[in-house]
A protein has these predicted regions:
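Short beta-strand scaffold segments in enzyme catalytic cores
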Residues: 27-34
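C-terminal binding/interaction regions
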Residues: 2-21, 67-135
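Glycine/serine-rich anion-binding loops at beta->alpha junctions
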Residues: 34, 45, 86-88
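Hydrophobic "anchor" residues
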Residues: 38-39
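Stable alpha-helical structural segments in soluble proteins, enriched in small hydrophobic residues
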Residues: 12-15, 56, 60, 64
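Compact, glycine-rich, soluble single-domain proteins
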Residues: 44-58
Length: 135
């Protein structure tokens, strides 16, 4: 693992402390590395109406996007699970749209890690090219 990935995981672990997860007690922290070196973080926020909550990855990327960031090179996700957790399907779709070429590094609080890519997580994803008309 590179020093940059280790630093990004540390940022995700720190972001995890801000998680609001009273229903599942499954705290998640995420960090995105922009091409200019800026690190954007987020934590999951749950709601009693489960579908209204947001995952840490989407909190981080939406925060970054609304502050002008557009080019991301890496995503880190940290959970307290027994094995590294990858982003959910909705987060994979959002990451494909805004960070398709990013590396994804996931880790547990115990230090177990996994490295992959956004495209590997969603190999046949729906993107702008899917909207092209054949008529």
């Amino acid at each position: 693992m590179s020093d940059a990935e280790a630093s990004l995981l540390a940022a995700a672990a720190a972001a995890r402390a801000a998680a609001i997860c009273p229903h599942s007690n499954f705290a998640v922290g995420a960090a995105l590395l922009a091409s200019d070196g800026t690190v954007w973080t987020g934590a999951n926020v749950e709601n009693a109406s489960y579908t209204l909550g947001l995952c840490a990855e989407r909190v981080a990327i939406f925060y970054a996007l609304t502050h002008g960031a557009r080019d991301f090179t890496a995503v880190a996700v940290v959970t307290g699970a027994a094995t590294p957790s990858t982003p959910c399907g909705a987060c994979r779709q959002i990451l494909l749209e805004f960070a398709a070429d990013a590396t994804v590094v996931t880790a547990t609080t115990a230090g177990e890690t996994m490295r992959t890519s956004v495209r590997a997580l969603l190999p046949f994803g729906f993107d702008a090219s899917s909207l092209a008309r054949s008529e």
